Amino acid sequence: QSTVATAVMAAQKHPCEPRSLTLMAGPIDCRINPTTVNKLATDHPIEWFQTNLISTVPFPLPAWGRRVYPGFMQLAAFVSMNPERHLDAHKSLFRHLVEGEDDEAEKIKTFYDEYFAVLDLTEEFYLETVAWVFQEMRLPLGRLKHRGELVDCSKITRTAILTVEGERDDICSVGQTSAAHELVTKLRPHLRSHHLQPGVG
């Protein structure tokens, strides 16, 4: 979304166009090195996602009646991709606690505090993302529109762009984020940078 917003602002010559943009592990072009997540998105029609993954928030919760992709379902999907890794991490946590290795235990606890911090996604946002990003690849194919106008990333000429990817990322694989550099065709080389972090997933 930040890439699209920057492109729209650049096309409008908006005075608040950002000076820099950092893209971290966000899918710009899902055709590159498709992952299990990409395969799931392309193997099912959008109606499947609406039927199987969207729920209504129950009463008396504050957002009751709202249709969402629940955080607990997102988390279950993430964990199910690498169950052995998560099981091993919790075994290590237990071992560190038993052996009094508090610093090591705290690292694992801190990671999972962040990992488990997921929010419900609204139905509209989630289904649009699946359709437009993962199924139709609208941005890299030049088909994404904002208020009826095609989004043209070549309009980005003043915003420096840094892309960051993890070598072992199995959700947004190597190349899917750095594909942004292929879209900003008029951005000068000194305003582009890419970082691939080895061993990170």
What residue spans do the PLM features occupy?
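Alpha/beta-hydrolase-fold enzymes
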Residues: 6-124
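Short beta-strand/loop motif that positions the catalytic acidic residue
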Residues: 156-157, 162-165, 169
